[in-house]
Amino acid sequence: MVLIKEFRVVLPCSVQEYQVGQLYSVAEASKNETGGGEGIEVLKNEPYENDGEKGQYTHKIYHLKSKVPAFVRMIAPEGSLVFHEKAWNAYPYCRTIVTNEYMKDDFFIKIETWHKPDLGTLENVHGLDPNTWKTVEIVHIDIADRSQVEPADYKADEDPALFQSVKTKRGPLGPNWKKELANTPDCPKMCAYKLVTIKFKWWGLQSKVENFIQKQEKRIFTNLHRQLFCWIDKWIDLTMEDIRRMEDETQKELETMRKKGSVRGTSAADA
């Protein structure tokens, strides 16, 4: 058995703008999660072409320990809390697989994302068979809804309900911002449809861990997209060439940061 959820994140930007904004935000957020021997190591970031599909391939290693729940740390052997993330970004479609060498075939996280120019109203964009689709829970993430944010994660300067972009004049996002967006044809809009499939086969822990991971994925998607919108003035003028240069610099920074300093960023204890 696997646990599948589809997270839908609506944003007041275009699919084209989001491509740059998402890559910028992921690079910045990675720095906030790296230090003291933990965090993110980038092994590969290169173009790929496979069966007519073209895009950017990345292979990252997540060195975790304090970032997993205590009940997992207690039973996890030394060195087992290392996760490999491989992503094939053929934008506007992206596929990410997370695996663990210790658990082998008993664990994976698969995230498939379609980015569409709509307000999150499309059904089964990933083309699942009807029986599987019936089991999928749909979760709507509202980036302006503070109640969806963990108290420990809240930052006023990353709150779309307070932020207004100087360059685009977008924001602040009020309680009815999605309805207002639907009634404003000239304002860009899009939705990231993120299908998350989780398998964790460990007797006695399976449902507990699968539910924990889905909760963490929602938390990550919520925080990242709130940041993405509030950082729009930092990335809206960037090109993909600028982003690739930034990613190269970030890769070197992460390597240095991971080897020194203290553990940074979100921990499972906050969840």
Curated annotation (Swiss-Prot):
Matching InterPro entries: PI_transfer (IPR001666), PI_transfer_N (IPR055261), START-like_dom_sf (IPR023393)
GO CC terms in record: cytoplasm; endoplasmic reticulum membrane; Golgi apparatus; Golgi membrane
Keywords: Acetylation, Endoplasmic reticulum, Golgi apparatus, Lipid transport, Lipid-binding, Membrane, Phosphoprotein, Transport
Pfam family, one: IP_trans
Localization per record: Golgi apparatus; Golgi apparatus membrane; Endoplasmic reticulum membrane
Domain of life assignment: Eukaryota
Positions of modified residues (N6-acetyllysine): 215
Tissue and organ distribution: Expressed abundantly in brain, kidney, liver, and lung, but in a lesser amount in testis.
Processing after translation: Constitutive phosphorylation of Ser-262 has no effect on phospholipid transfer activity but is required for Golgi targeting.
Catalytic reaction equation(s): a 1,2-diacyl-sn-glycero-3-phosphocholine(in) = a 1,2-diacyl-sn-glycero-3-phosphocholine(out); a 1,2-diacyl-sn-glycero-3-phospho-(1D-myo-inositol)(in) = a 1,2-diacyl-sn-glycero-3-phospho-(1D-myo-inositol)(out); an N-(acyl)-sphingosylphosphocholine(in) = an N-(acyl)-sphingosylphosphocholine(out)
Residues recorded as bearing Phosphoserine in the entry: 262
UniProt GO MF annotations: phosphatidylcholine binding; phosphatidylcholine transfer activity; phosphatidylcholine transporter activity; phosphatidylinositol binding; phosphatidylinositol transfer activity; sphingomyelin transfer activity
Main location: Golgi
CDD domains: SRPBCC_PITPNA-B_like
GO biological process: in utero embryonic development; phospholipid transport; retrograde vesicle-mediated transport, Golgi to endoplasmic reticulum
Activity regulation, free text: Phosphatidylinositol transfer activity is inhibited by N-ethylmaleimide.
Family (UniProt): Belongs to the PtdIns transfer protein family. PI transfer class I subfamily.
Function: Catalyzes the transfer of phosphatidylinositol between membranes. Also catalyzes the transfer of phosphatidylcholine and sphingomyelin between membranes. Required for COPI-mediated retrograde transport from the Golgi to the endoplasmic reticulum; phosphatidylinositol and phosphatidylcholine transfer activity is essential for this function.
Protein's name in the database: Phosphatidylinositol transfer protein beta isoform
Lineage: Eukaryota, Metazoa, Chordata, Craniata, Vertebrata
Annotated gene: Pitpnb
